[in-house]
């Protein structure tokens, strides 16, 4: 047995093939934004792993929300009788800028309403395709699993299309539930088919998680941190109506963040990056957009960052410019130094 020396070389060529095969929209990192320390690695005799080279990036030269990709290729191999498997000659190094921002802390004392989602002219009244996504960090979970006080609402519409922790019926208060999932031809959520489900995991406090529901007109898929965890084929397709929610007495409520069944069932935790789309986002798009997306992205109806920047009237700006600002209710504070990717 002999040592094997492998020479590597950054190859900043086109990445169209990589994007096409993965469904991503990566860009080449800007010139001078990264360094590669060394070009050679050694596989010691009798070993199966090589030494390492270090790739460093200058975050000041990277943009928020952009996924960068750099090709690194094997140019030569010396020693032993190993040959390069051509399909593995090139590796792709992913670079993403770490974002440090504030997040809204609801503390079971506050929430946000989206008044412009209600009414006959609502942009979310009949969604033939849809993506709903959000980042949350639970601070605590209720102790009363067998009452409505054990529910922690995240975002959506009560008795219609809602993400929450717990169900108030004895299930653990730290399990994520997707409630009702109303989809169908009828306009009223109660008259649609229902596709609710649970995430079979009990969550801990103090950790960020990203969840999403994606509907493409036929299939409803649920994602956790960019990975698909559930899917169901709808019986008859149809639309989703996020303009209506049950307030405990009537259907005059609408989409809200951090509450449900009226002003109740609040969430004790941080929230960030809530978005509603009229397109079905792909797995790769969800992964790439966990921390940030371009507010002008196609199909993006509304986008709230909850990063501490508020308007004169106290609302949180809809970053798309469509005017669906989030109206605060109750006591909401903002916490510093929240990092993403998490």
Label each PLM-derived region with a short phrase.
Residues 225-252, 288-291:
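Short, solvent-exposed beta-strand-to-loop segments that form ligand-recognition rims
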Residues 96-106, 137-139, 168-239, 332-342:
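Extracellular glycan-interaction surfaces
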Residues 89-107, 292-342:
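Extracytoplasmic low-complexity segments
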Residues 116-132, 199-207, 264-270, 294-297:
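Extracellular/lumenal carbohydrate-interaction signature centered on repeated Trp-anchored short motifs
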Residues 1-101:
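Short boundary segments that mark the start of a structured unit
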């Amino acid at each position: 047995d002999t040592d094997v020396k492998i020479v590597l070389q950054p190859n900043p060529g086109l990445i169209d093939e990589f994007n096409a095969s993965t469904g991503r929209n990566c860009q080449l990192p800007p010139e001078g934004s990264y360094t590669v320390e060394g070009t050679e690695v050694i596989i010691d005799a009798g070993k199966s792993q090589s030494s390492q080279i270090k790739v460093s990036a200058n975050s000041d030269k990277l943009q928020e929300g952009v996924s960068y990709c750099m090709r690194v290729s094997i140019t030569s191999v010396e020693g032993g009788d190993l040959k390069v498997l051509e399909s593995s000659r090139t590796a792709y190094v992913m670079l993403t800028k770490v974002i440090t921002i504030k997040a809204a802390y609801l503390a079971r004392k506050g929430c946000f309403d989206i008044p412009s989602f209600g009414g006959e002219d609502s942009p979310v009244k009949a969604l033939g395709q849809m993506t709903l996504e959000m980042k949350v960090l639970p601070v605590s979970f209720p102790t009363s699993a067998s009452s409505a006080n054990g529910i922690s609402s995240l975002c959506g519409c009560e008795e219609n299309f809602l993400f929450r922790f717990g169900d108030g019926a004895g299930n653990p208060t730290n399990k994520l539930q997707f409630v009702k999932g109303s989809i169908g031809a009828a306009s009223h959520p109660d008259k649609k088919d229902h596709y609710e489900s649970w995430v079979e995991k009990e969550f801990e406090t103090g950790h960020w998680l990203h969840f999403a529901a994606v509907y493409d007109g036929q299939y409803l898929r649920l994602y956790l941190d960019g990975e698909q965890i559930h899917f169901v084929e709808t019986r008859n397709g149809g639309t989703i109506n996020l303009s209506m929610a049950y307030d405990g007495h009537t259907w005059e409520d609408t989409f809200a963040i951090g509450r449900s069944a009226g002003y109740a069932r609040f969430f004790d935790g941080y929230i960030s990056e809530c978005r509603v789309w009229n397109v079905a986002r792909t797995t790769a798009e969800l992964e790439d957009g966990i921390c940030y997306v371009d507010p002008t992205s196609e199909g993006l109806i509304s986008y709230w960052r909850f990063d501490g920047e508020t308007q004169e009237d106290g609302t949180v700006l809809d970053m798309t410019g469509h005017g669906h600002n989030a109206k605060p209710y109750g006591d909401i504070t903002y916490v510093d130094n929240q990092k993403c990717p998490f």
